[in-house]
């Protein structure tokens, strides 16, 4: 196993159990490791600190263990997945008869940086965000089969677009186990079609589950607008919450089809819902003030810090339009899923938008990701989803 030696005093974050080693902290290697190989990390004084997957790029090593004696083998993967599953079962997420849609592995939050596994009924969708996790995919799939047992029949691997561009790897999406295309899953008693083959992320935004449930509580008797609706998750919950009407908007015709496909089995023949394939900003420009509950859940405006300024301008512009159009006494659910946008950045953008609109606005809830998307206390960067529920006078 190759060794990585750090520059003097560059081990402090690792001693606080942060799971990343940046390339600028590395003094030298004792050889030439291949991308994805497990390497050992040492201080400049040749003291062992951790082991992890090596990769060319800003984040050079993603830590898998801080224990020198721990081998990265089949037992390791089984143990880590068992810990992840047991945590979710203990808090009522896994094994819930009304909800078979959840995140089993959330990267650094489960001490498995670079790995995401979502469960949709009897299918697990696995996604690698590092070369090491890609190379270990079969060992992980075998461990997943052992841990989940008869609870899953299929493991679908979806990493064609998630590996860093510098990695000299060409992953192909496809089934590692099974091959069923039965893609209906349940979330709190509601049925959803999950497009893991061609959909965004792993096919569904699992991270908004609790926020969708919260919206249901506010929907009764309200006219609801769900912008950037994608699968229509918020729309389905608004319908069950007895909204007066629900309009879903997305620039993608495919998303509109998927939204309608999710509305119909839950509310067959219900005429309260309509969906429109249209640019969000254009729709907000032309709409009247007929809505008293608006959801803004756009895709990530900033995937990297160099796009932060433009992203914040985008959030301001979007929220200004919503503040200007929402009815008095209306409720705005507004989100950012950009990791590069901090809670403070996002809140400032929304505050500025409120001030520009001249409306009186109060914060009812400050939202984040659910418990199956845990944040390691040693890796605060893992808290990526920000949301506010606002009362607009």
What are these regions (language model features)?
Residues 1-119:
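Non-catalytic accessory regions of SAM-dependent methyltransferases
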Residues 105-118, 134-205, 213:
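Non-catalytic substrate-recognition/targeting regions of SAM-dependent transferases
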Residues 221-230:
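Conserved class I S-adenosyl-L-methionine
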Residues 231-243:
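Conserved SAM-binding loop of SAM-dependent methyltransferases across substrates and taxa
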Residues 245-250:
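Conserved SAM-binding motif I beta-strand of class I
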Residues 252-295:
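S-adenosyl-L-methionine
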Residues 291-321:
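Mobile active-site "lid"/loop adjacent to the S-adenosyl-L-methionine
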Residues 331-393:
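C-terminal catalytic and target-recognition region of SAM-dependent MTase-like enzymes
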């Amino acid at each position: 196993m190759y060794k990585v030696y750090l520059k003097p005093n560059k081990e402090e974050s690792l001693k606080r159990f942060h799971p990343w080693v940046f390339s600028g902290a590395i003094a030298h290697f004792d050889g030439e490791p291949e991308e994805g190989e497990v390497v050992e990390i040492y201080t400049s004084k040749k003291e062992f600190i951790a082991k992890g997957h090596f990769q060319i790029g800003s984040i050079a090593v993603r830590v898998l263990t801080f224990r020198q004696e721990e081998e990265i083998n089949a037992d390791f993967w089984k143990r880590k997945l068992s810990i992840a599953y047991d945590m979710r079962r203990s808090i009522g997420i896994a094994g819930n008869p009304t909800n078979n849609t959840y995140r089993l592995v959330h990267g650094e939050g489960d001490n498995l940086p670079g790995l995401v596994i979502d469960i949709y009924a009897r299918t697990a969708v696995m996604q690698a965000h590092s070369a090491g996790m890609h190379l270990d995919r079969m060992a992980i799939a075998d461990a997943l089969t052992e841990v989940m047992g008869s609870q899953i029949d299929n493991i679908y691997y979806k990493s064609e677009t998630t590996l860093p561009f510098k990695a000299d790897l060409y992953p192909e999406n496809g089934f590692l186990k099974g091959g069923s295309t039965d893609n209906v899953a349940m979330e709190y008693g509601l049925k959803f079609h999950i497009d893991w083959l061609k959909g965004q992320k792993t096919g569904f935004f699992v991270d908004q589950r609790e926020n969708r449930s919260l919206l249901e509580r506010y929907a009764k008797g309200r006219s609801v607008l769900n912008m950037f609706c994608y699968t229509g998750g918020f729309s389905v919950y608004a319908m069950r919450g007895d909204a007066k009407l629900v309009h879903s908007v997305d620039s993608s015709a495919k998303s509109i089809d998927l939204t309608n496909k999710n509305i119909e089995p839950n509310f067959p023949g219900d005429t309260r819902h309509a969906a429109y394939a249209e640019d969000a900003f254009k729709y907000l420009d032309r709409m009247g003030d007929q809505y008293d509950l608006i959801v803004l859940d756009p895709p990530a405006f900033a995937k990297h810090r160099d796009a932060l300024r433009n992203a914040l301008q985008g959030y301001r512009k979007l929220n200004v339009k919503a503040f200007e159009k929402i009815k008095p006494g209306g409720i705005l659910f507004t989100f950012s899923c950009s990791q590069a946008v901090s809670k403070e950045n996002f809140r400032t953008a929304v505050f500025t938008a409120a001030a520009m609109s001249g409306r009186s606005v109060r914060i009812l809830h400050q939202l984040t990701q659910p418990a199956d998307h845990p944040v390691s206390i040693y890796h605060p960067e893992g808290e990526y989803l920000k949301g506010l529920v606002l009362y607009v006078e």
